[in-house]
């Protein structure tokens, strides 16, 4: 039976991706749209239909995935420079930190003075099934950190002490490459049932190791639900 509504997709128990982004049987949810269509849809989701609100606060645009730097870099320039995106001030790119910035996109980010870019770097640990050399790429993180005016931080999804030991090793490799930035640990768990099993231990590990703690706030506020 084909799942027709996004909200009817099962919620992944332990990972961060959606079923629509990684499983072929749900690929019909991944629709290709023109940049104009994407802009109109984004604006329809904003509280006031614009990126800078009347109270002076701005709405951040977050590019996530899957992996947002895998295939669409050249179109991001077109998206950011669209006339209806002229008041966009902040963009966060949630990346697994394995994909280098293409030359054109890198040049754009280095030259635009309008948009503040933050790289939210979440490298995969061995629990994800990725090999170390495929997942931990200090040269890529160094490139991100070198973007003019950019911010960067690491966010690792962990479940136990063994995961945190990997974080310590990875962070040292990034530091050896010249990348010094905040490090957050987030408890593994796509649903409240799994999340509550890990949250206290991860918080205590953060205090013991000197890392920052990142909760899954949407689970605490809304539980196991799509659209949060």
Where are these regions (language model features)?
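A structural motif corresponding to the C-terminal end of an alpha-helix
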Residues: 45-51, 55-58, 83-87, 142-152, ...
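Radical SAM/AdoMet-radical enzyme domain recognition
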Residues: 61, 77-166, 179-181
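Secondary-structure boundary/capping motif
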Residues: 71-72, 129, 163, 194
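Auxiliary Fe-S-binding modules of radical SAM enzymes
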Residues: 160-228
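Well-ordered, non-membrane alpha-helical segments in soluble/globular domains
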Residues: 35-42, 76-78, 134-141, 167-169, ...
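Active-site beta-loop-alpha junctions enriched in small/polar residues
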Residues: 66-68, 96-98, 124-126, 157-159, ...
